[in-house]
């Protein structure tokens, strides 16, 4: 989990705000530079006292669990028969608890993968998602939804309205059939019907049944697929015609998982079902959807032609979390009803003990199973494996139909005698070019072998493959012939220059410098002469080996402790090579992260390569077709030069004539039949080798053999060879964290070297002294480094300062609490919030922005993040016009206030009055933050901060810049701004899918945030505050943010605008403020909205007042 000194996205910012035990202190101390090796022991000891207590309690429970259960069973066995009903009730209660736990764990795994897949689709535009909701209370019915946005509803943009269809919302304990009908513009847009007699749901869109789903009841044995939402999408294009698409949950999963069914599909609408068109139109700058009850929709827009995939995936993600929250609420209600029945009868402690212990035992087992453990595995081979290199050769065919000509040293060669006159004994040769257009369809070597091995965790197969890069690359190879010593092939008659017409000779196919290396007794060629592809010198020969670690947690990686040795036999010579295994984290085609060991060794380090010949095996029906006679002109006779091939020089050279167009036809398994030779195009002179040396370091591939210097090469893995590797396992194949980290190897090495002898991560994290020792070892030899660097270096996968692994512990802890609701006072918010926190944690671990690399099919979209749009934006809101107030303000008072994306700002609360002490504290805090404070000043601020009595008022400012059409828009979200006033009046709320409206009184907390939106259409940076309704804040929230009581009569629009501008002025010009920390980050589409939504949804939990220590605690 990334710390605040390395914020990359809004989820990281949210983690700064989360009230997780012991995190705020560590974050604050890292920020203030107070964490060093010297004071680390005392600091962690004080910080983690509570965590040690929790760990000790868990340990004691596990030790005494079996004893407690035995006692409980003994006591229950003493019960009389009159207590049978009581035992039945207890069993019912226990069953409910375990059933909820089982269902929650099942849904957790299901939704986890769904959420992780969704996080792979990050927005590639700066166009936002606008939420809109309509309550089911008819008295509060809104006739229409009008979204007024400047420069949005034009012919340059498309708009989508996305509505969820939640099957879980229609499943309840009622017996009658349930239906939901939504009308748009007088038409039945869609209807959903649930038949309880067979638990089947029917979805109709515009009168057509688009899906039929069999449902499972909540609380019984569930099927996770039943709880995945489907989507109804209305797309309005340039011509104002609305298209209706239905996207079932199955198609969403296929789209996210890159199903083979959709290999060539790139747009989400391609996998959706297009139902029809509607009569809805977009006119006069607004969109209207009339008479829509029970609707929780999202409205998005982007330039025409730009895919809405990422925004729709983000919307779907939020609906997934809503569904889980609803399910959890229903489960808790069910549990409470059973518990009420249990508590209505008098029970002894023994009665209640047994189900509680069983539940605790199950949860502890689940926690243990979900905890990654450090494993040391030794992978060995049972027996000696001998394999011909050719049987594991894999060649990539890189030829295409457009590759028509290959260069070659093949040549026709003949001696001509004149019976009358001279010259005599003239040596003439004609080089040949080869047509390779049919090589694209040739079948070539594509083999590998699995060598059986064993490890401590079971069988480990080693996949072996030989690769020779570029062996069938038209840019890197030529055509040559391999044939036995002394072989001659007659293939055309030739008339020599100036010779009488009756004198001619037979042109013979000449051999290349590689020919004499291939003696017939050593090389079993099917024909005496075979064509082949000749690769350049120094071509590598890679022996590649792969071992899959299926039980590993990919996010935590691993480290190879010891490599093994393999051998290459070449005749009587044996060459030994050491493997070079590395731990690689990769994403499979299904989108799942996996871990494997990969080794690639170039054997030419000991067996150098001067030449490669890939023989195209001649078939029995291969034929060399004779050509017509040809007359040749005299060109460059008797010229000599030299030619170098590899380490050898060939000196006896004679002139010859070049002729093009020698056709080569490919047959199955790369079989070649030479075609008719064309001697009509004589181009230029070249040289031809007539005499040869031998002994070239040549590789020749013939059938299943690879020959080196004429001898077949054999691969051997000696018996007993072993590879030792350390990695982290996840027994449930459902690891606590599932991260995509481009620096996984380095991170895993840090973790393993910290304490490679530990049995598990849990053991390391539960022992403070071990953790301190591990940290200090990591710090050596530069002990002056701060712990923040160590935490950052391991990518936040396991925080050495946080002993409980991952937010799944929080989830399990909540389930444990549910088992005893009378003591814990738990409600469904706790479990829902825990799961949301876990999803956000998993998302930020999986995608650490800034470490991603191109080429990952699941993450390619991240390459197009609109960072340039933000970084190139020159219109900073320096001056803000406030039209209702009739004034303009210059924004900011800090040097690094203007250009940052996230600021944490402190203001003097003046609790100590105006005077030197107040000024001195402000200056001291500023010096600490700027690393300019002395030892005394640092410790003073640290002590005040730890006790949360630092006399300053904190708030956070998050800035997001967009360009919408021709308008530059800056959204500034302030959190921690309320001064303790309350939100007056009543608040109405409806549960997802529920028709009942709940009236909640006494909601006495501030909104927790204020959203200032300013826009500009000019290049000079003059920004103007927008209408307050664009911010999405209500009248109540604006009055609460201003610290004013809401009037008894609703204020006018102009009055609210005046108050809105006053808040903007106060926040942008506040004197005495300074930025404690700022972060340059890229806020992607929807992230600012998501963060704001988190604040809103947690208002009832935290009661945002933000005064005194609350604000400091929040901003920590």
UniProtKB/Swiss-Prot annotation:
Residues at the catalytic site: 953, 1111
GO annotations of cellular component type: host cell cytoplasm; viral outer capsid
Record domain PPPDE: where: 929-1116
Keywords tagged on the record: Capsid protein, Host cytoplasm, Outer capsid protein, Virion
Source domain of life: Viruses
Localization, UniProt: Virion; Host cytoplasm
GO molecular function, one term: peptidase activity
Known function: Minor capsid protein present in the outer capsid, which is required for adsorption of the virus onto host insect cells (Potential). Could play a role in the host plant virus induced dwarfism.
Family: Belongs to the phytoreovirus minor outer capsid protein P2 family.
Subunit description: Interacts with host ent-kaurene oxidases OSKO1, OSKO2, OSKOL4 and OSKOL5; this interaction.
UniProt protein name: Minor outer capsid protein P2
Organism field: Rice dwarf virus (isolate Fujian)
């Amino acid at each position: 989990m990334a710390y605040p000194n390395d914020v990359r996205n809004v989820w990281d910012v949210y983690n700064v705000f989360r009230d997780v035990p012991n995190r705020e202190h560590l974050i604050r101390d890292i920020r203030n530079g107070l964490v060093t090796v010297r004071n680390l022991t005392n600091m962690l000891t004080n910080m983690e006292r509570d965590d040690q207590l929790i760990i000790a309690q868990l340990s004691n429970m596990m030790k005494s669990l079996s004893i407690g259960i035995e006692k409980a069973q003994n006591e229950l066995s003493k019960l009389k028969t009159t207590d049978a009903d009581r035992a039945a009730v207890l069993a019912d209660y226990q069953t409910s608890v375990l059933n909820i736990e089982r269902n929650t764990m099942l849904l957790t795994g299901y939704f986890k993968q769904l959420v992780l897949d969704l996080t792979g689709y990050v927005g590639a535009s700066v166009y936002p998602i606008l939420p809109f909701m309509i309550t089911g209370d008819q008295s509060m019915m809104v006739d229409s939804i009008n979204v007024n946005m400047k420069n949005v509803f034009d012919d340059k943009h498309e708009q989508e309205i996305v509505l969820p269809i939640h099957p879980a919302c229609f499943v309840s304990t009622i017996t009658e059939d349930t239906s939901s009908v939504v009308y748009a513009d007088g038409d039945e847009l869609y209807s959903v019907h649930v038949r309880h007699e067979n638990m089947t749901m029917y979805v109709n869109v515009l009168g057509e049944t688009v899906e039929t789903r069999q449902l499972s009841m909540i609380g019984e044995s569930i099927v996770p697929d039943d709880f995945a939402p489907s989507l109804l999408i209305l797309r309005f294009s340039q011509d104002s015609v609305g298209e209706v698409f239905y996207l079932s949950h199955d198609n969403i999963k296929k789209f996210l998982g890159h199903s083979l069914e959709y290999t060539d599909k790139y747009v989400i609408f391609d996998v959706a079902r297009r139902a029809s068109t509607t009569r809805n139109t977009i006119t006069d700058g607004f969109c209207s959807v009339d008479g829509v009850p029970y609707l929780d929709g999202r409205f998005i827009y982007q330039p025409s032609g730009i895919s809405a995939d990422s925004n729709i995936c983000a919307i779907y993600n939020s609906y997934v979390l809503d569904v889980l929250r609803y399910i959890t609420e229903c489960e808790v209600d069910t549990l409470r009803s059973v518990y009420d029945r249990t508590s209505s009868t008098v029970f002894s402690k023994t009665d209640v003990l047994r189900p509680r212990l069983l539940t605790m035992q199950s949860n502890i087992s689940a926690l243990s199973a979900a905890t990654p453990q450090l494993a040391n595995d030794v992978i060995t081979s049972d027996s000696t494996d001998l394999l011909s290199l050719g049987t594991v050769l894999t060649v990539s065919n890189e030829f295409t139909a457009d590759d028509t000509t290959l260069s070659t040293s093949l040549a026709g060669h003949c001696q001509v005698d004149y019976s009358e006159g001279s010259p005599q004994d003239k040596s003439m040769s004609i080089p040949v070019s080869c047509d390779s257009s049919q090589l694209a369809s040739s079948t070539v070597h594509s083999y590998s072998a699995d060598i059986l091995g064993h490890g401590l965790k079971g069988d480990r197969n080693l996949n072996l493959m030989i690769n020779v890069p570029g062996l069938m690359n038209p840019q890197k190879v030529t055509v040559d012939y391999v044939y036995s010593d002394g072989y001659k092939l007659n293939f055309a008659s030739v008339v020599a220059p100036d010779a009488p017409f009756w004198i001619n000779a037979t042109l013979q196919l000449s051999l290349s410098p590689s020919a004499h290396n291939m003696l017939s007794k050593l090389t079993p060629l099917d024909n005496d002469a075979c064509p082949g592809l000749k690769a350049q010198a120094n071509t590598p020969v890679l022996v590649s080996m792969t071992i899959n670690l299926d039980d590993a947690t990919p996010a935590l990686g691993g480290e190879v402790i010891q490599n093994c040795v393999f051998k290459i036999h070449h005749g009587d010579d044996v060459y030994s090579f050491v493997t070079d295994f590395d731990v690689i984290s990769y994403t499979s085609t299904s989108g799942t992260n996996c871990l494997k060991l990969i080794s690639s060794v170039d054997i030419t380090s000991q067996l150098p390569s001067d030449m490669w010949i890939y023989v195209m095996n001649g078939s029995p029906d291969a034929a060399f077709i004779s050509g017509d006679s040809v007359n040749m002109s005299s060109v460059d006779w008797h010229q000599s030069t030299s030619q170098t091939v590899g380490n050898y020089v060939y000196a006896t050279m004679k002139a010859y004539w070049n002729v093009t167009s020698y056709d080569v036809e490919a047959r199955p398994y790369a079989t070649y039949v030479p075609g008719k030779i064309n001697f009509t195009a004589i181009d230029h002179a070249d040289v031809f080798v007539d005499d040869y040396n031998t002994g070239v370091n040549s590789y020749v591939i013939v059938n299943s053999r690879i020959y080196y210097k004429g001898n077949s090469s054999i691969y051997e893995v000696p018996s007993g060879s072993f590879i030792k590797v350390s990695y982290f396992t996840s027994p449930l194949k459902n690891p606590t964290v599932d991260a995509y980290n481009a620096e996984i190897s380095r991170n895993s090495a840090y973790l393993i070297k910290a304490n490679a002898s530990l049995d598990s991560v849990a053991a390391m994290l539960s022992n403070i002294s071990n953790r301190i020792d591990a940290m200090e070892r990591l710090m050596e030899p530069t002990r002056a480094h701060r712990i923040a660097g160590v935490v950052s270096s391991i990518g936040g996968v396991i925080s050495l300062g946080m002993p409980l692994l991952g937010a799944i512990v929080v989830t399990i802890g909540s389930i444990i609490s549910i088992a005893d609701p009378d003591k814990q006072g738990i409600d469904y918010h706790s479990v829902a919030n825990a799961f949301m926190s876990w999803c956000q944690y998993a998302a930020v671990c999986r995608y650490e922005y800034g470490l991603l690399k191109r080429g990952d099919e699941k993450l390619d979209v991240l390459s197009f993040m609109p960072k340039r749009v933000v970084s190139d934006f020159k219109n900073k809101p320096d001056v803000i016009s406030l039209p209702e107030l009739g004034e303009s303000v210059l924004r900011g008072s800090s040097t690094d206030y203007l250009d940052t994306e996230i600021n944490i700002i402190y203001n003097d609360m003046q609790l100590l009055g105006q005077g030197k002490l107040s000024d001195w504290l402000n200056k001291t805090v500023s010096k600490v933050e700027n690393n300019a404070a002395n030892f005394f000043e640092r410790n003073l601020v640290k002590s005040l901060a730890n006790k949360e009595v630092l006399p300053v008022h904190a708030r956070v400012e998050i800035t997001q810049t967009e360009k919408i059409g021709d308008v530059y828009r800056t959204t500034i979200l302030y959190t921690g701004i309320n001064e303790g006033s309350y939100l007056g009046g009543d608040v109405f709320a409806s549960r997802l899918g529920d028709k009942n409206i709940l009236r909640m009184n006494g909601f006495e907390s501030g909104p927790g945030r204020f959203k200032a939106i300013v826009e500009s259409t000019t290049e000079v940076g003059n920004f103007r505050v927008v209408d307050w309704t664009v911010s999405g804040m209500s009248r109540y929230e604006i009055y609460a943010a201003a610290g004013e009581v809401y009037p008894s009569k609703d204020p006018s629009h102009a009055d609210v605008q005046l108050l809105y501008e006053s808040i903007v002025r106060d926040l942008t010009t506040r004197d005495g403020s300074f930025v404690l920390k700022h972060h340059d980050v890229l806020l992607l589409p929807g992230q600012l909205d998501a963060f704001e939504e988190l604040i809103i949804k947690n208002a009832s939990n935290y009661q945002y007042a933000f005064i005194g220590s609350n604000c400091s605690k929040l901003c920590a």
